[in-house]
Amino acid sequence: MCIRDRFHTDPTLKKGYRIAINNDRADKVWWKMTGSLVSVRNLTKSFVKEDQWFKMDIRVAGQEIDVNINGEPVVEYIQPTAPYRTDANAYALLSEGTFAIESDGSGEIQIKNITVNVIDESTIDINAQLAEANDEQNDEIIKLHQSDFPVLDYHVHLKGGLTKEVAAKQSRKTGINYTIAPNCGIGFPITNDQQVMDYLNEMRSQPFILGMQAEGREWITTFSPETLKEFDYVFTDALTFKDNKGRRTRLWIPEETWIENEEQYMDMIVDRICSVLEEPVDIYVNPCFLPSPMDKRFDEFWTEARMNRFVEALAKSGKALEINELYNIPNKAIIMKAKAAGVKFTFGSNNVTPNVSDLSYSIRMMKECGLTAEDMYKPKVKI
């Protein structure tokens, strides 16, 4: 059951903003969890367990709406001069009015206390707020929220100077929810079960979904299955493997890609991808990556036969397919085939700097391939 707190509404409950109260992680609409400023800043992370008391603070000051859960900020939204709204959300605007609590399902609502405090508006610099607001008429992210599409970057790394504090602030500013994923494996920051648990104990209370990037092919024996289940999901790529001569290959490093015959090398890459798809992960990322200089002829090497073989193996594995922002892969043809095969999708920055993507390639592929909310992978969020 989803409960919504409306404010600045009227007796018919037709206008004003809505804040979601929904701790049901089994909900089919998994992108409107507690604290969501509905259809403006939808939240994919569940912060509170079911049947658990919590405190939610909603602050409206000038053009800014802030939502805190148990003292932690989850929404910081500034309504711009020209907000983008669909017809269905045309009245989701700041104005004046009353408060209401409504439910769209059956069940009991338990609320201990509701307190309203008046803010001294003379201390608010609305012009300064508006200067910080997003240009929503040219913002694809608000359009996703308005169309009821889950807005989640499933593949973000704390690297290149990006801290969890900066990432959280950036996420609230852009309206893009983040999954933070450490690189786990031999030669990477996390190399054993204890380090995984230490990391999760530190990060579980943060406003992110928590993923794991499984590195290399040795990761399966490096981490226990029980530890892997502590992540909200696990993903891997097929960029590291042994070639046909037994040499350790990392496809993004030219010195480790020994290409004698491009067609034969391409067949080997497809073989390795299909092998990786048998590993126990949830999402296949950096998909269909090709090394330089083959990457310049991506469509040429990914022939119909190779695409069909890959998509068949992917669909059989039950894994989701990432649409990757760093490399702008895979191409439309592969995405269309995967969609037809019933594969689920994720959007992923795979950032190497603090500048996390705006998901522009993913959104373009979403539009061109007709992806809907039902096509997106649902994380198994733990609290």
Question: For the regions a protein language model found, what residue spans apply to each?
Answer:
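Conserved, mostly hydrophobic/aromatic
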Residues: H155, V234, N286, L321, ...
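Carbohydrate-interacting regions of secretory-pathway proteins
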Residues: R4-Q137
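Extended substrate/RNA-proximal surfaces in nucleic-acid metabolism proteins
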Residues: N192-K316, L371
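Charged catalytic cores and adjacent phosphate/nucleic-acid-binding surfaces used
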Residues: N134-S147, F298-I383
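Short, charged, surface-exposed secondary-structure boundary motifs
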Residues: V29-K32, P189-I190, D243-R247, N355-L359
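Flexible loop residues that form catalytic
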Residues: I119, C184, L239, F289, ...
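An N-terminally biased module of ancient metal coordination in phosphate/nucleic-acid-related enzymes
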Residues: D135-E218, P291-E300, R309-F310, G348, ...
